Design a protein with these regions (language model features):
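Conserved structured core elements
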Residues: 160, 256, 264-267, 298, ...
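Extended, domain-scale alpha-helical bundle/helix-rich regions
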Residues: 116-190, 506-603
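Active-site cores that bind ATP or allylic diphosphates and position pyrophosphate for catalysis
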Residues: 338-495, 503, 553, 562, ...
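N-terminal Rossmann-like or analogous alpha/beta NTP/dinucleotide-binding catalytic cores
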Residues: 1-365, 455-478, 482-491, 496-503
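Core subunits and conserved enzymes of cellular information-processing
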Residues: 456-457, 464-466, 529, 533-535, ...
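Glycine- and acidic
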Residues: 251-260, 284-291, 443-451, 509-515, ...
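Hydrophobic/aromatic-lined pockets within catalytic cores
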Residues: 278, 309, 336, 340, ...
Length: 809
C-alpha cells in the first residue's frame, strides 16, 4: 500500500488524499493502471488531477480507451476538465485511435482561445441580456455567468480568464455596487448623511436569500448531462422503446434502503434527484430498495416518505424494488440462459481467495464458473424452492476476472434469505442483491438519469454490463460527491452502539444529524435545503464544518421566528414603589421592524422575574445590567428599574431583589435592556416550561473517527455534557399566542393532530432559537379552550443567536 500512496502522491495528491485513494479497493487499481499507461513517473499537479478525475469516471464503454485518454492527458493534448469530459463522451461512442482527427476536433485539442476572443464571447452574451442585467443589476450576475460558461465559442477557453473578463465587463456595464444592490446599506448611508438630531432608525436587516435548485444545478457537469434518448444502447430499438415510454421527459429516482432514518447526506441526494427532475420538467420516483428482508422495517418506510415530503418534495410514484421481484427473477433466468450467470457453492473465504485474497494475488475462476447452463438453471430452481440453506448456493454474474475493476469480478446476483419480507411475506426465499436489482429497477422504470454518489463510480461498469447482458434499456449513471458535516457520525451501526450504551435515547435525538433528529430539534427544512444547495454539485466528497449549516439555520429562523421573552433561571423582582394590584398592559411586537408578524400584549405588574444571568451582586465599570444601586431597562417598558435591596434565603442564595420603578422625574436612558416576565396569574403569566433542553455537539472533534486526533475511537470522543436540562424556566404569554396562531391554521391543526409540534418555533430574546419537542403534552382542545394549566411544555434549543461581543456586559 505504501507504494501506491507514493505513486498517487506523484500526481500531486495530498498525503491524506493519496492514502484514501490507495485504500479504496475500487479506485486504487483503476488509477494505478492509468498511471502505468502514461509511461511516466512524475506529473505536474494539473495533469495529475486530470488523471485522478479520469480514474473516477471510467466506465465499461470508456475502459477500452481509458489508456488512450490517459496518454492524451500526459502529453498535454487533454489539458482541462472540459476537454476530459468531452473525451470520455467521445470514447463512449467511437474509437479515438481509428478517428483521431475527429477526436481532436470533438475535444478541442490544440484549440487556443485568445484574450480578444474571450472578450468578444463574453460581450456577446452580456449584450444579449443587457436589458435584464440593467434591471436586475448584480442580482442577475449569477445567471449571466452561467450563460457565459455555456457559450460554444468559449467552451475551450481558460475558465479563469473568462471569469476575469466577465467581472470586468459587468463592472463596466453596471458600475460599482451601490444602494440598488444593497438597500439596507443604502438606508444606513442615507441616515448617516442627514444632519439631524432625530434618532436614527436601525437599518433594515438583510433578507435571507437561500440558494435555489436552479442555482445548485446550473453549473458544472450536472448542467451538461445528456438529454433523454442520447445515451447509447446495445441495440437501437431500446432507445425507441424508452422514448415511447417516457415521451422524452426526464425521469429520476431517489432509492433509499428502508433500514434506518435518512441523514443530512441524504438531504443532498433528495435535492439532487428531485431537483434535477423538477428543473428539467420531469418527474422523480421514490423507490425503496427493499431487497434485504432482514434489515427493513415499516417504521423506516414511513419515516423516509415523511422526510421527503418534509423537505418539500412529492414523489411522482412510490415504488419498491419488491414490486419487480418476479421480473427480476425472470431476468436472472435470462442471464443464466445467455451463459452469463452461474450457480456457485463457494464459501466466502473461497471466493475471496479466488479474487486474489488480501495479498491481491492472481485471480482464478471459480470451479463452478463453467458448469453447463442447464445445470445452473436447475440449481437456481432449487434455490427458489428453498432446497438450499443460506450461503450454500448463490447466483453469480460471469463478468471479467481479468478486469482491473473489482466490481467486475463475478459479483453475486442472488442469495438465499429465509426471512419474512415486509411486503411479500414468505413468497420468496431468494433475493436479488443491490448490484443486480439496482440497475435493472432503473431500467424497468425507464430512469433517464441515475444520479448517485461517487462511491458507486466503479460500480457503473458492472451496472452497464448487466443491462447489456440481459438486453434491456441502459440508463446513464452519473456520480456526485456525498456530503457529511463535522462533529458527528452518520453510520447507523455506530449510532445504535452509542444509543445502546446510553449516550443518546433514540436515533432522532436532537444532537444527531439524522433528518428526523434535525426536525425534532426544530431545524426548518428550508434551512437544510439552502445549505445543500449553496454547496452545489461536484464530484468532490465534502465534509463541511457544521457551523456553516448552523448559519443557514440561524438566518432562516431570523426570518420566520416570532420573538418572545423568557427567563431560563428566574430571580424574583419586587417593585417596591408600585401598589400590590398594579397592572399595566405592554404591547410587544413579535418581530421588531417587521409589522407583518403583528403584536401581542403582556401584563406588567409589581412582581416580575428576570434571569439570574442579568444580575450581579458585585458591580464593575464594564457591566451594564442590574446590580445593587444600579439601573437597567426592561424590554419595551417605559421606565427603568434600580436595585435597592438583595434579600437572601438561609443558605445564602438570592430570594428576591427589591427594586424601584423609576417612573418619577427625568431618567437617563439605560445602556442595556433585559427580558422580564410578569407574575400575573389572572393573565396566565408566566407560562411555565417543564424542561428547556440545551444541546451542544455530541462529539468534541470535527472527525470523531479520525485515529490521529481521536486515538481511542469515537466512543471516547463523546461529550457527556452535550445535553443540559433546565427546569423551572418561565416565558411570557406571547408564547401561548404563538401556539394559538399556529393551531388556528389548517396546516397547524393537521400537524398537531399527528403530535408534530416542532413547527412551533420562537426566538427567546437574547438567548437563542427554540422549538417545542415531541415530548410536549399539548392537545388541540387545550389550545382552543386556553387551558394552559394542563400543557406540559418541553422545548429544545435549535441554535444560539449570533455571537455578540457585548452579551456579557
Amino acid at each position: 500500500m505504501d507504494n501506491l500512496i507514493s505513486r498517487f502522491e506523484s500526481l500531486g495528491l495530498a498525503p491524506v488524499k493519496a492514502k484514501e485513494a490507495a485504500g479504496n479497493k475500487k479506485l486504487a487499481p483503476a488509477l494505478d493502471s492509468l498511471i502505468s499507461a502514461t509511461g511516466q513517473t512524475t506529473f505536474d499537479k494539473p495533469t495529475g488531477m486530470l488523471l485522478y478525475t479520469l480514474a473516477t469516471t471510467v466506465t465499461k464503454e470508456k475502459t477500452p480507451h481509458a489508456n488512450y485518454i490517459a496518454k492524451a492527458i500526459a502529453t498535454g493534448r487533454i489539458a482541462s476538465v472540459e476537454q476530459l469530459s468531452a473525451a470520455t463522451k467521445f470514447c463512449a461512442k467511437s474509437d479515438p485511435v481509428a478517428n483521431e482527427q475527429v477526436f481532436d476536433e470533438a475535444c478541442g485539442v490544440g484549440v487556443v482561445v485568445g484574450d480578444e476572443e474571450i472578450a468578444a464571447g463574453v460581450r456577446s452574451v452580456i449584450d444579449s441580456i443587457k436589458d435584464s442585467l440593467l434591471a436586475e443589476r448584480y442580482r442577475g450576475q449569477g445567471k449571466a455567468l452561467g450563460m457565459v460558461k455555456k457559450a460554444p465559442e468559449l467552451r475551450w477557453a481558460d475558465s479563469g480568464k473568462v471569469k476575469s473578463e466577465f467581472d470586468a465587463q459587468i463592472l463596466a456595464l453596471l458600475g460599482p455596487k451601490d444602494e440598488r444592490d444593497d438597500p439596507a446599506a443604502a438606508k444606513k448611508a442615507s441616515a448617516a448623511s442627514k444632519a439631524s438630531t432625530a434618532p436614527v432608525k436601525a437599518p433594515e436587516p438583510k433578507k435571507w436569500e437561500p440558494a435555489s435548485l436552479e442555482s445548485m444545478l446550473s453549473d458544472g457537469d450536472i448542467s451538461r448531462l445528456h438529454k433523454p434518448g442520447e445515451n447509447p444502447q446495445i441495440r437501437p430499438g431500446l432507445v425507441e422503446e424508452h422514448l415511447c415510454a417516457t415521451k422524452g421527459r426526464v425521469i429520476t429516482r431517489f432509492p433509499p434502503e428502508p433500514n434506518g432514518y435518512l441523514h443530512i447526506g441524504h438531504a443532498k441526494a433528495i435535492n439532487v434527484n428531485f431537483g434535477y427532475a423538477r428543473t428539467h420538467g420531469g418527474t422523480c420516483n421514490l423507490r425503496y430498495d427493499d431487497t434485504n428482508p432482514e434489515a427493513e422495517e415499516q417504521e423506516y418506510v414511513d419515516s423516509i416518505l415523511d422526510t421527503v415530503r418534509w423537505l418539500g418534495f412529492e414523489p411522482d410514484k412510490i415504488l419498491y424494488s419488491s414490486d419487480y421481484f418476479q421480473e427480476l427473477y425472470e431476468l436472472a433466468v435470462k442471464l443464466i440462459e445467455n451463459g452469463l450467470g452461474y450457480i456457485c457453492h463457494c464459501t466466502k473465504e473461497e471466493m475471496n481467495k479466488s479474487r486474489g485474497g488480501e495479498e491481491r494475488g492472481p485471480r482464478v475462476a471459480c470451479k463452478h464458473r463453467d458448469r453447463p447452463i442447464s445445470e445452473s438453471l436447475a440449481e437456481f430452481q432449487k434455490m427458489k424452492e428453498g432446497r438450499y440453506a443460506p450461503q450454500a448456493a448463490i447466483l453469480r454474474m460471469k463478468m471479467d476476472l481479468e478486469d482491473g475493476n473489482p466490481q467486475m469480478w463475478d459479483p453475486i446476483a442472488y442469495r438465499i434469505i429465509f426471512s419474512t419480507h415486509h411486503r411479500t411475506g414468505d413468497t420468496w426465499c431468494i433475493y436479488p442483491t443491490y448490484d443486480f436489482a439496482h440497475c435493472l429497477c432503473d431500467s424497468i422504470e425507464n430512469i433517464t438519469h441515475s444520479l448517485c454518489t461517487t462511491e458507486f463510480i466503479l460500480a457503473r461498469q458492472a451496472y452497464y454490463w448487466l443491462c447489456d447482458a440481459v438486453d434491456v434499456y441502459k440508463p446513464v449513471q452519473w456520480e456526485y460527491g456525498r456530503l457529511s458535516v463535522t462533529n458527528t457520525i452518520l453510520s447507523k451501526r455506530k449510532l445504535l452502539k452509542i444509543r445502546d450504551m446510553g449516550f443518546i435515547n433514540s436515533l432522532d435525538d436532537p444532537r444527531l444529524y439524522t433528518l428526523p433528529a434535525l426536525r425534532r430539534r426544530g431545524v426548518p427544512p428550508q434551512a437544510i435545503n439552502a445549505f445543500v444547495r449553496e454547496l452545489g454539485v461536484t464530484t468532490a466528497t465534502t465534509t463541511i464544518n457544521v457551523v456553516r449549516l448552523e448559519n443557514h439555520i440561524r438566518d432562516c429562523l431570523n426570518e420566520i421566528a416570532p420573538r418572545v421573552m423568557a427567563v431560563v433561571n428566574p430571580i424574583k423582582v419586587v417593585l417596591e414603589n408600585l401598589p400590590e394590584d398594579y397592572f399595566e398592559e405592554i404591547e410587544l411586537p413579535f418581530k421588531p421592524r417587521d409589522p407583518s408578524f403583528g403584536t401581542h400584549k403582556v401584563p406588567f405588574t409589581r412582581v416580575l422575574y428576570i434571569d439570574a444571568s442579568d444580575f450581579r451582586e458585585i458591580d464593575s465599570p464594564d457591566y451594564f445590567r442590574l446590580a445593587p444601586n444600579k439601573s437597567v431597562g426592561l424590554q419595551n417598558v417605559p421606565c427603568p428599574i434600580v436595585c435597592t435591596e438583595v434579600r437572601k434565603n438561609a443558605d445564602g442564595s438570592i430570594a428576591e431583589l427589591v427594586c424601584r420603578y423609576q417612573n418619577v422625574g427625568k431618567q437617563s436612558k439605560p445602556k442595556t435592556y433585559i427580558q422580564w416576565i410578569a407574575d400575573c396569574p389572572k393573565a396566565g403569566s408566566p407560562v411555565r416550561l417543564n424542561e428547556v433542553r440545551i444541546y451542544d455537539p455530541l462529539f468534541r472533534h470535527p472527525d470523531p473517527c479520525d485515529k490521529a486526533t481521536v486515538p481511542d475511537g469515537y466512543i471516547s470522543d463523546i461529550n457527556e455534557d452535550s445535553l443540559k436540562i433546565a427546569k423551572g424556566a418561565l416565558v411570557e404569554t406571547g408564547l401561548w399566542d404563538v401556539i394559538k396562531r399556529y393551531a388556528a391554521t389548517d396546516a397547524g391543526k393537521e400537524e398537531l393532530s399527528k403530535h408534530n409540534v416542532e413547527n412551533i418555533r420562537v426566538q427567546f430574546m437574547r438567548i437563542g432559537y427554540f422549538a417545542l419537542d415531541k415530548d410536549t403534552v399539548l392537545s388541540l382542545a387545550d389550545i382552543e379552550n386556553n387551558n394552559t394549566g394542563s400543557a406540559n411544555l418541553v422545548i429544545n434549543r435549535i441554535v444560539t443567536l449570533k455571537e455578540d461581543s457585548k452579551k456579557d456586559a
